[in-house]
UniProtKB/Swiss-Prot annotation:
Protein name as it appears in the record: Putative pre-16S rRNA nuclease
GO CC terms, sorted: cytosol
Listed PANTHER family: POLYNUCLEOTIDYL TRANSFERASE, RIBONUCLEASE H-LIKE SUPERFAMILY PROTEIN
Source organism: Streptococcus sanguinis (strain SK36)
Annotated GO biological process: rRNA 5'-end processing
Length: 139
């Protein structure tokens, strides 16, 4: 079963994919979006769904530290509903608290990547962490 992990932001969607057995997650790419213009990167997402024969989506939910939901949670759920209807695939959600922080820490401490380069990969790495956390908890 191939699962696609998504880190949905207001400007980009980080994309990760599981291996065919569902053991490991790998970051794929960052899709630019523009919420205000109604551009959600769905065409590119569709290309990736076909290329990787995706069976399911996992979307990170950016809950607050006190477990409450804010506007980004609602935006992520709306994105999930949109892609579920468009692609006819199930969508699960994964708590993503601190995944971007963890991704940034990994890039700084382990890879010593500059700030400008981090911006180019942070969402992809966050999507990978979201998906890997999901795989570790569910398979």
């Amino acid at each position: 079963m191939r699962i696609m992990g998504l880190d949905v932001g207001s400007k980009t969607v980080g994309v990760a994919i599981s291996d065919p057995l569902g053991f490991t997650a790998q970051g794929l790419e960052i899709i630019p979006i523009h919420e205000e213009k109604g551009e959600f990167g769905l065409e590119r997402l569709g290309e990736l769904v076909k290329e990787y024969k995706v069976d399911k989506f996992v979307i990170g939910l950016p809950k607050n530290m006190n477990n409450t939901s804010g506007p980004r949670v609602e935006a992520s759920q709306a994105y999930g509903q949109r892609i579920a209807e468009l692609f006819g695939l199930p969508v699960d959600y994964q708590d993503e608290r601190l995944t971007t922080v963890a991704a940034e820490r990994m890039l700084v401490e382990q890879a010593d990547i500059s700030r400008s380069k981090r911006k180019k990969v942070i969402d992809k790495l966050a999507a990978q962490l979201i998906l890997q956390n999901y795989l570790d908890r569910n398979f």
